[in-house]
Amino acid sequence: NQIAIIGNTRTRENVIRRQLRIFPGDVYSQERIARSYREVMMLNFFANATPNILPVSEDKVDIEIAVEEKPAGQASANMGYTQSLGMTGGGGLALPNFRGKGQSFSFSFNIGTNIGGSDSYNYQNLNSNQPKYRTASISFTDPMVNDTKNLLGGSIFYRLQGGGSTAYYSPLLTTLAGGSVMWGRIFKWPDDFFRGTWSFQMARRINQGTEEDLDNYAGGMKQSDGISLTQAIRRDNRDHPEFPTIGSHFSLNSTLSGWLLGGQENFHKHTLNLEWYTPTFWKFVLTNSFKFGVIKELPSKYGGISFIPYNDRFIMGGNGIPYGNPLRGYDDNGVGPLTNSLNPIGGNTMVKIGTEFRVPFAENPVVYGILFAEMGNVWSSNDLMERLNLPRRGPMDLKRSAGAGIRFFMPMIGKLGFDIGYGFDRIDSNGELDPEWKTTLTFGQQF
């Protein structure tokens, strides 16, 4: 008969209604009510959403959906110390339900200084005490413009990184600035769990460093322009955004940079990511993941130099910051091709396989423990079969780790995570096997 929504003190009612899969006048369907509940919860705006069935007559019922709002935004913070970078830290502001309209607005910054740190390079035109890592970005996205299935978004970003020999960043001092625009759409086929986004990005990169490092990391160029198109197709039917117990998440991202679009950064890059969740006994959940990526250089359509920026290649290890490929139990960004001074130079092929056994300790707020085992690696070659017959050099040369961790999703704190992992195949600076334990920590604050 009717559908009423109560408890939405911040979120506008249309944001909730556009997620529903059952409407006034429809035949009663428990399956469609369950799907509506799932869609509302996956917004991640609510601690709970309870559909109540209220009989009206012999053949009619009303549905009342009672929601409980979560904190409106999230302020994140991180801090650490490394020998090369000294103190590192940053923060940001994310409003996933901006103005109560379901739009997302975010701003972030990060900085690393080498106070008390060391440099292997001291370029004549660089101050060795300046930050080696400084980023800022701002973005806005409307996932359902005017309650349609269309998404619109945009972002601008600035990044300065490098300037010294570190286990994290290029020895080049690189400044990157640019922006992007994005359009997306919810699909009807194969099913409405699928959606796609298409983004156009332009950025300018300015590099400073020795001639040798410019050749190794930037194709010998002090300045380059990158113009790219990216397509992202994903399917997500998980039952909960913070602690999924069933369902899967699939994404396929493809980027074309340069070539017909112009610029000096000419390549195509593809990344496949699969995650699936299986309930076992009691409330234990088995989580499996697989990630594969490949990047290949393209010739310049208009002549001139063509290259792939090293930070567009695949870099793995530790917490994965800032390249997005963590591997617990290993040095941060220390897995894959390295220079003689043990700097990551990036690879063209990446594989990662992981398994987690999760057990919930609390539901509201969400707290759960993790037992994990994972393995992965990055290679210079695009051909996984090229070195199959050589020990520790082929596609099965995966760096293995195992360990445990815990996750908290708490009001006024946000996401708090701690992992300790044992890297079975860790190699020291002398090339000798040196397995050991490594820890990682993540922190965020909600308000």
Regions found by a protein language model. Give the residues of each.
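Gram-negative/organellar outer-membrane beta-barrel architecture
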Residues: 26-242, 248-251, 284, 328-329, ...
